[in-house]
Every structure is written in structure tokens, then in C-alpha cells.
Curated annotation (Swiss-Prot):
It is found in: Periplasm. Keywords: Periplasm, Signal, Sugar transport, Transport. Part of an ABC transporter complex involved in D-apiose import. Binds D-apiose, D-ribose and D-ribulose. Belongs to the bacterial solute-binding protein 2 family. This is D-apiose import binding protein. GO terms for molecular function: carbohydrate binding. Coiled coil: none annotated. D-apiofuranose binds at N35, D111, R112, D158, T159, N160, R164, N214, D239, Q260. Residues 1-21 form the signal peptide. GO terms for cellular component: periplasmic space. The keyword Nucleotide-binding does not apply. SUPFAM superfamilies: Periplasmic binding protein-like I. Gene3D superfamilies: 3.40.50.2300.
């Protein structure tokens, strides 16, 4: 509760200390900025909104549905022109967005879908299934199509976690000599990725690879492997973070990841919000998929802030 109050106070102070731009206010709400993916979303959306002449409020719900509800309510009370949201849950988010819509505040979702259409104006998400297949194909290649491996799963309430896992197994399960010896949830967390990897490694010392539902967990797994002297174990992630880029280029355990373009996705959401505010339409379907890109040693140098340069 104290954290919630602190966030709301910060949001209120931010609103009161800005001089509003002519175009009004856009609220940008994401999960915790401790995760560089979500920070890239927030930074990308903020940059584009201010470039287009809007004042911005940036806040994090920390994957807490109640906190998210309060932040959306605050955005509505501040008469925001639009909300850019990476939500705290596909089901629990619907009610708050329905209230925002009824109050005339349109929502533009990024990264995570909700389980209802017609509530948000746009849902712009990565093609998680396609990206997971890219990661899995590279993982199988790096593993030589055989060996014991581990899968680290994301937060169970996040549909992206299950979609990515399904994409992984659509590819990996075609190879009978690939043997999954452990599958554990690490909740998108680097700390949990480290602790899960430590315990899994003790129980399964012969593992050859780790495939992870995001880069943050992959980095935690890599740290545990390094601490155990296991530089031989292959790790493949998902997201396209700069930290993973650095590991790939340095020849660390992490060999590849699937880039989901957080920066570009967030900026596109703001562009669509601006068009909707001005014209009443984005000119696009509500649900939009952005394909992921495989990142490995061949192109990692071009990666910066979840965006790949030409």
C-alpha cells in the first residue's frame, strides 16, 4: 500500500509540475523499469509522445493489478488524451480499461494482449510464437540436435509465457534426442533465474543447454552457470536486451535471443494514439503483430535499446 501511495503521489506531482503541451497528456504505464525491456518501452513511448507535442506521465504498476487500476484511474482523472499500457494481466486489466473507455480515454496496448476485443483501440504485440520458434531453431542447432536441457518459464499469469513455451516446443519436440530434464517458472526475474538454475544444476549436472522465456531469466541462469564453472552450457533467451547482446559478443554462455522490438512497438503505439486523437481512427486493425528477429553473433553489434539498426 505504501508503494502504491508513493507511486500515486509521484504521478500527481509529475502532473502538477509539468506545463501541459498544447496536445494534452499521454499516460504511459508499464511493468517495473528494473527490467530493461519495460524501461525501453517507457522511454520509447515518452520520446515519441513529447516529440509529437504531448506532456507525458510515466508510471509502473509492478505487475500489481490493484496498483494498475489506481494508475489508470489517475490518468482518467487527469483527463489524459490516451493511455499507453503494457498491462498487469490479460483478464484483470479489462475492467479498468472499460472504465477508461467509458470516460473517453482510449487505451493503446503494447507487448501483452488482453482477453477481450473492443476495449482497447490498439493491441500491438510481438509475434511471440514466431519469435519463440526462431529461438528454438537456433537452440536446437547450437545443441547439435541432442542433449539434456532446461526450460525457464515466465510469470504464469502472463499469456506471453505460455505462448513462448508452446513455440519452443513446437520446434524442440521434433528432435527425439533433445531431452528436457527440468522446466521451472522464474517469473521473468534475474534473481529467480539464478536461484532456479543453481538448484536445477545440482540435480541435473549433465545438462547441455538452457532455453529461457526472457533475457532477464537467461542472465540469471548464465550467472549461476558461471559461478559453477559451467561455461560449456548453452543459453538462449528471448527479448533482445543490450545485456544479452554484450554476453553474445563476449562469448558468454548466452549465444542467441529473439528480439521483440520494444522501442519500436511503444513508439508505434504513440503514433497510433496521436492519429486516433486527431482523427478518431488509427486506420488499422485492433490486434497487430510485429515479427521478432533472431539475434546471434552475426548481428548482435547492430542491437541497441531493443532496436536493430539497418
Amino acid at each position: 500500500m505504501k508503494l502504491l501511495k508513493a507511486s500515486l503521489v509521484a504521478l500527481s506531482l509529475a502532473a502538477s509540475t509539468f506545463v501541459y503541451a498544447d496536445n494534452g497528456l499521454i499516460a504511459i504505464i508499464t511493468p517495473s523499469h528494473d527490467n530493461p525491456f519495460f524501461k525501453a518501452e517507457a522511454d520509447g513511448a515518452k520520446q515519441k509522445a513529447e516529440e509529437l507535442g504531448y506532456t507525458t506521465l510515466v508510471a509502473s504498476h509492478d505487475d500489481d493489478a490493484n496498483k494498475q487500476d489506481q494508475l489508470i484511474s489517475t490518468a482518467v482523472s487527469r483527463k489524459a488524451k490516451a493511455i499507453i499500457l503494457d498491462n498487469a494481466g490479460s483478464d484483470v486489466t479489462v475492467g479498468a480499461l472499460e472504465k477508461a473507455k467509458a470516460a473517453g480515454v482510449p487505451a493503446f496496448l503494447i507487448d501483452r494482449e488482453i482477453n477481450k476485443t473492443g476495449v482497447a483501440v490498439s493491441q500491438i504485440v510481438s509475434n511471440n510464437y514466431q519469435g519463440a520458434q526462431l529461438s528454438a531453431e537456433k537452440f536446437v542447432e547450437l545443441m547439435g540436435e541432442k542433449g539434456q536441457y532446461v526450460e525457464l518459464l515466465g510469470r504464469e499469469s502472463d499469456t506471453n509465457a505460455s505462448v513462448r513455451s508452446q513455440g519452443f516446443h513446437e520446434i524442440i519436440d521434433e528432435y527425439p534426442e533433445m531431452k528436457m530434464v527440468a522446466q521451472q517458472t522464474a517469473n521473468w526475474s534475474q534473481t529467480e533465474g539464478f536461484s532456479r538454475m543453481e538448484s536445477i544444476l545440482q540435480a541435473n549436472p549433465n545438462i547441455k543447454g538452457v532455453i529461457s522465456g526472457n533475457d532477464t531469466m537467461a542472465l540469471g541462469a548464465e550467472a549461476a552457470l558461471k559461478a559453477a564453472g559451467r561455461t560449456d552450457v548453452i543459453v538462449v533467451g528471448f527479448d533482445g536486451s543490450d545485456y544479452v547482446r554484450d554476453s553474445i559478443l563476449a562469448g558468454g554462455n548466452i549465444k542467441a535471443t529473439a528480439l521483440q522490438p520494444a522501442w519500436d512497438q511503444a513508439q508505434e503505439a504513440v503514433v497510433q494514439a496521436d492519429k486516433y486523437i486527431r482523427t478518431g481512427s488509427t486506420g488499422k486493425e485492433e490486434k497487430q503483430l510485429m515479427d521478432c528477429i533472431l539475434i546471434d553473433s552475426s548481428n548482435a553489434k547492430k542491437l541497441n535499446k531493443f532496436s536493430l539498426s539497418k
